């Protein structure tokens, strides 16, 4: 039976599972949750959701940026990065907040039992990203390993944070539906959430009792 979220139809809610793509599916149908991979453009709320999921399930939140970026924004060499992440995903439980597909391929999502795609509207993610970045820049907030936001890194060039966020948002919408409907993900629960409200409702229905081995 297909049900909406709350009292409104959840036409934008999709779950990919063993029965294929199901629009408007009940988020309570998610199976045992122990390894969660979260994907989404910058500003979509990955870190916030990962923190909440990790606390709810009693597993660590793995912030991949903190592993990948060393001091002065140096990047860990790809072979070393992949080896480190292979160790991470071999653990019994975790919530991982970035996929890094260009360097890791499908390593993280294929190791997960549940994949959450935060597909919020671009204007929402960009507004959130602008507020977050401005706050970090003004307060000189340390991100990872002594790194802080710079205006050059945020605003200028094709590799700027905003350009990157827009490109990833468009790329995900173009490629992820076909990817997650493919045979490699038939044993996964893949949840596509398109609003903050859907995120809250889904999180409320994923409790520690759904963790592997729970009563």
Q: PLM features: residue spans?
A:
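Hydrophobic anchor at the beta1->P-loop junction of P-loop NTPases
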Residues: 38
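A glycine- and Lys/Arg-enriched "phosphate-lid" helix/loop adjacent to the NTP-binding pocket
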Residues: 120-172
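Extreme N-terminal, non-catalytic leader segments
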Residues: 3, 9-33
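The conserved Walker
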Residues: 42
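Conserved nucleotide-sensing/catalytic segment adjacent to the nucleotide-binding pocket
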Residues: 60-115
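Hydrophobic positions on the alpha1 helix immediately C-terminal to the Walker A/P-loop
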Residues: 49
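NTP-dependent small-molecule kinase module
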Residues: 22-31, 56, 163-215
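Conserved lysine of the Walker
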Residues: 46
């Amino acid at each position: 039976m297909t049900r909406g979220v709350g009292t409104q139809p959840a036409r934008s809610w999709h779950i990919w599972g063993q029965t294929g793509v199901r629009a408007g599916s009940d988020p309570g149908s998610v199976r045992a949750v122990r390894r969660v991979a979260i994907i989404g453009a910058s500003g979509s709320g990955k870190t916030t959701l990962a923190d909440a999921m990790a606390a709810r399930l009693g597993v660590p939140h793995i912030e991949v940026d903190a592993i990948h970026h060393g001091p002065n924004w140096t990047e860990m060499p790809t072979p070393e990065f992949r080896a480190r992440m292979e160790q991470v995903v071999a653990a019994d439980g975790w919530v991982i907040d970035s996929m890094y597909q260009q360097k890791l391929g499908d390593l993280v999502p294929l190791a997960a039992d549940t994949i959450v795609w935060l597909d919020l509207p671009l204007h929402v993610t960009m507004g959130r990203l602008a507020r977050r970045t401005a706050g970090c820049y003004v307060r000189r907030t340390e991100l990872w390993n002594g790194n802080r936001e710079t205006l050059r890194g945020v605003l200028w060039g094709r590799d700027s944070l905003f350009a990157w966020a827009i490109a990833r948002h468009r790329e995900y919408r173009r490629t992820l539906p076909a990817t997650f409907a493919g045979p490699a993900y038939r044993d996964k629960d893949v949840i596509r959430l398109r609003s903050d409200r859907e995120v809250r409702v889904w999180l409320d229905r994923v409790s520690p009792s759904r963790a592997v081995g729970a009563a």
